[in-house]
């Protein structure tokens, strides 16, 4: 991945720390990957039609699997209606300076004209700050993605439970 033209995380892109090119491949079709594709899609259709292309590669059968209900359906429908290309049950097999290869249905396919690779997978909780504070004797409550990767609904619920116990 280090040799690919332009690699960034979804967090950096959404936070304005990195800027994508014209053909964007997003690896990871979870909530973050789909939200990133949805965010980029208006740039494709509203500002400069046919000037950019967004592809999402997801290993599993289901996009945004951790989301539920109407929110998930709205996100996926909106993303697809904006022209985002989705490859489910596809696994990235190789990333070189010039290409991204993936396996789907037992065949290897290559995207050779992409200029931006966005990583939107593999999030892990980070409890370092809470651990350091606890070691210093400070009472802590670890919530949201710092505790376990999830969604805003779960984080709010966890926060409510802790607040009720204080």
How should each PLM-predicted stretch be described?
Residues 75-84:
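Helical element adjacent to the flavin cofactor pocket in flavoenzyme catalytic cores
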Residues 88-99:
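A conserved short coil-to-beta-strand element within the FAD-binding core of flavoproteins
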Residues 1-67, 101-166:
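Rossmann-like dinucleotide/flavin-binding elements
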Residues 5-7, 83-85, 90:
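Short, conserved active-site loop motifs that form the nucleotide-linked donor/cofactor pocket
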């Amino acid at each position: 991945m280090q040799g690919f033209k332009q690699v960034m995380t979804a967090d950096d892109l959404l936070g304005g720390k990195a800027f994508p090119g014209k053909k964007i491949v997003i690896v990871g079709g979870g909530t973050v990957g789909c939200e990133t594709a949805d965010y980029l899609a208006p740039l494709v259709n509203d500002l400069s039609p046919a000037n950019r292309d967004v592809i999402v590669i997801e290993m599993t059968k289901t996009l945004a699997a951790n989301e539920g209900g109407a929110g998930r359906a709205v996100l996926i429908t909106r993303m697809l209606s904006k022209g985002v290309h989705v490859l489910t049950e596809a696994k990235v097999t190789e990333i070189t300076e010039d290409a991204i290869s993936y396996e789907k249905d037992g065949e290897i396919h290559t995207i050779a004209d992409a200029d931006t690779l966005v990583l939107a997978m593999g999030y892990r909780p980070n409890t370092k700050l809470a651990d350091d504070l606890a070691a210093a004797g400070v009472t802590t409550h670890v919530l949201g993605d710092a505790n376990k990767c999830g969604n805003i609904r779960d984080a709010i619920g966890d926060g409510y439970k802790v607040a009720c116990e204080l």
